[in-house]
Amino acid sequence: MASQGTKRSYEQMETGGERQNATEIRASVGRMVGGIGRFYIQMCTELKLSDYEGRLIQNSITIERMVLSAFDERRNKYLEEHPSAGKDPKKTGGPIYRRRDGKWVRELILYDKEEIRRIWRQANNGEDATAGLTHLMIWHSNLNDATYQRTRALVRTGMDPRMCSLMQGSTLPRRSGAAGAAVKGVGTMVMELIRMIKRGINDRNFWRGENGRRTRIAYERMCNILKGKFQTAAQRAMMDQVRESRNPGNAEIEDLIFLARSALILRGSVAHKSCLPACVYGLAVASGYDFEREGYSLVGIDPFRLLQNSQVFSLIRPNENPAHKSQLVWMACHSAAFEDLRVSSFIRGARVVPRGQLSTRGVQIASNENMETMDSSTLELRSRYWAIRTRSGGNTNQQRASAGQISVQPTFSVQRNLPFERATIMAAFTGNTEGRTSDMRTEIIRMMESARPEDVSFQGRGVFELSDEKATNPIVPSFDMSNEGSYFFGDNAEEYDN
């Protein structure tokens, strides 16, 4: 990409740093995950969790959510000003699961946010460590991406539910910063912009006055983030049009939906990071591993290696399949919800099945679920190989656009074709090429028509043995070219509701 020189790596965004060399980046990312680990250990001590209870992913998620809530400035301020019945704005908590007399019991805990902030800062050398918080948000976002479908959200904004592969990061909070923006899919950005434009259409004062000026700046910033994800000149030019519009309205919504559809074939660059649950970092720190000294990367071998050596448990409902629960969490850990199943299966060394065939619900347990029948099992999070995470859409021929599949946004930099139903996608592009963006639309459609499903992406890139930490011997897998690998095919997952 032409602008590569000005880009910070995503580890730099993650750690809020300016340009650093590779060693400094590895050290600062190590410092970040080490801080998460230290915080987790301290929380387990506070809550008197046994070793087994501390390795329970549901407990990890509760603790992560507590610290995110404790640092959510805007929501805290809102809660102070709008006191609601039964909600103490100064407290945070959630369900903690304990093992008692051979059964799992749920205990609702409540903590002062101030106390949680103190423990977090103490674990992070007295700093706020915003990067670590963002890291936890991205882990939750990746878990949501693997667990829920966003059909309803897509339909509400006028998009097609088959565009789900563009929705990475759709549940990330707004305060997730540059690192959060990097992992958002094209569809997520389009949806945020459409919501904003719709508000402007319905509320005359939305773009006016001092507040309106701030709104406008936010709008243009979001447009620029989305523009940066596109890799073809025509798509970027269309984004300039949307950004510069005097009074954004239905024409802009049309343009954005057009761009989102085009991203099914002319894919955008979306970053992928392996963000693991806090308990995994906690286990490593507890065993004496020094993340800062050893260095850490979210896009290399490190997360794979960490998962090879971590034993994490999960609560299992009576009719759930533990292997399926493991697959769900494995995909979340590697940000692979939108990856081709052929690639995921090869790396994992076990068949990764489409979500419609999974006998498992989400990881979190609702407060009204019966604990009597709950069991727990070990999550199998190990892999056969490792591969480098990608931040490109896998477009071929000089980063022009190439084949995409109705639902793939590649996670791993591994050679494969990206099969897609051209007829299905192109059917959405009939007619409307008039108006001020007509030449760009025509150009985009032309590029899409010339894309071939058999083109190979990530030419020559392969997976690596777990013993090959310097990535010296790529193993280039061969895939059945016709077999498409969409995780969301024939889907029956629950909707994501806040």
Swiss-Prot record:
Chain ranges for the short sequence motif Bipartite nuclear localization signal as given in the UniProt record: 198-216
GO function terms (MF aspect): RNA binding; structural molecule activity
One GO term (biological process): viral penetration into host nucleus
InterPro entries: Flu_NP (IPR002141)
Modification comment: Late in virus-infected cells, may be cleaved from a 56-kDa protein to a 53-kDa protein by a cellular caspase. This cleavage might be a marker for the onset of apoptosis in infected cells or have a specific function in virus host interaction.
One GO CC annotation: host cell
UniProt subcellular location: Virion; Host nucleus
Short motif Unconventional nuclear localization signal, span: 1-18
Family membership noted in the UniProt record: Belongs to the influenza viruses nucleoprotein family.
Self-association and partners: Homomultimerizes to form the nucleocapsid. May bind host exportin-1/XPO1. Binds to viral genomic RNA. Protein-RNA contacts are mediated by a combination of electrostatic interactions between positively charged residues and the phosphate backbone and planar interactions between aromatic side chains and bases.
Function: Encapsidates the negative strand viral RNA, protecting it from nucleases. The encapsidated genomic RNA is termed the ribonucleoprotein (RNP) and serves as template for transcription and replication. The RNP needs to be localized in the host nucleus to start an infectious cycle, but is too large to diffuse through the nuclear pore complex. NP comprises at least 2 nuclear localization signals that are responsible for the active RNP import into the nucleus through cellular importin alpha/beta pathway.
Name the record gives this protein: Nucleoprotein
Native species: Influenza A virus (strain A/Duck/Australia/749/1980 H1N1)
